[in-house]
C-alpha cells in the first residue's frame, strides 16, 4: 500500500484551500489537477475526509473530477450535522459528536456558517470514557463556539466541575421535558440549536422538533 499525505496549504503536492470559512466550498489540488468542491458538509474535518477519499480513489484510477462529482451528490448521513428543522424561529441540528475533538470541530464548522446566530448546544456524555472524567479538562474549551451549553451526565461531580469552569454559559439537563420547555421559552429568532450524542439522548431532538414546530 502507498502512503499519501496532504495539507491545508500549498506546501504539499496534495492540498485543499477553503473558499468559504465553513469549508463547504474548497479548492482541491492533487499534483497538477485542481478542482472545486462544493457540498453541504461543514467544517475542516469534513474537508479532510473529502481529501482522503479523493486521494484514495485516485490510487484506484478514479479521476479527481469524478470523485468530486460523487461527493457533491452526497447529502450526508443521519446524525452528522443533520438539519432537523429550519423555520422563522430557529434552526435545529442533530449530530453524533460525542468526544471533545468532534464536539469542537462540529461547533467550529457551525459557527463559521451561522456567524450571527446564538448557538445553543445540548450535549450528552454517554460513553464510558466521557463519563469517566478523562476528558473533563477538554470539554469547556471544546464548546467555546457555543453561547449556551447544556450537559447531560450521570456523573454529578463532573457536571459541577463544568459549571464551575464556565458558570455563565453552562446548564445541566436534569429532565428532558423540563429542558425542552426551557429552551423553547428563551429561544429567539436566528438561534441555532444543536444536539450532540452517540445515543438516543432520550428523544431530545424529536421533542425539540415537535415543540419548536408549533
What annotation goes with each model-predicted range?
Residues 1-36, 73, 78-80:
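Extended acidic/charged loop-beta regions that coordinate divalent cations
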Residues 39:
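Histidine-centered acyl-transfer/condensation active-site motif
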Residues 32-34, 42-45, 52-214:
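ATP-dependent carboxylate-amine ligase
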Amino acid at each position: 500500500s502507498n502512503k499519501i499525505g496532504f495539507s491545508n496549504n500549498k506546501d504539499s503536492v496534495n492540498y485543499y484551500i477553503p473558499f468559504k470559512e465553513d469549508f463547504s466550498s474548497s479548492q482541491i489540488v492533487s499534483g497538477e489537477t485542481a478542482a472545486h468542491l462544493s457540498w453541504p458538509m461543514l467544517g475542516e474535518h469534513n474537508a479532510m475526509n473529502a481529501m482522503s477519499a479523493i486521494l484514495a480513489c485516485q490510487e484506484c484510477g478514479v479521476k479527481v473530477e469524478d470523485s468530486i462529482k460523487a461527493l457533491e451528490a452526497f447529502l450526508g448521513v443521519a446524525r452528522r450535522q443533520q438539519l432537523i428543522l429550519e423555520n422563522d424561529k430557529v434552526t435545529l441540528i442533530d449530530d453524533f459528536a460525542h468526544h471533545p475533538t468532534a464536539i469542537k470541530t462540529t461547533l467550529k464548522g457551525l459557527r463559521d456558517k451561522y456567524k450571527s446566530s446564538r448557538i445553543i448546544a445540548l450535549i450528552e456524555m454517554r460513553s464510558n470514557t466521557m463519563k469517566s472524567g478523562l476528558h473533563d479538562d477538554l470539554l469547556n474549551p471544546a464548546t467555546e463556539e457555543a453561547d449556551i451549553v447544556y450537559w447531560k451526565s450521570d456523573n454529578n461531580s463532573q457536571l459541577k466541575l463544568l459549571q464551575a469552569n464556565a458558570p455563565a454559559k453552562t446548564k445541566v439537563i436534569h429532565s428532558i421535558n423540563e429542558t425542552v420547555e426551557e429552551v423553547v421559552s428563551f429561544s429567539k429568532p436566528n438561534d441555532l440549536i444543536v444536539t450532540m450524542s452517540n445515543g438516543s439522548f432520550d428523544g431530545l431532538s424529536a421533542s425539540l422538533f415537535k415543540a419548536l414546530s408549533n
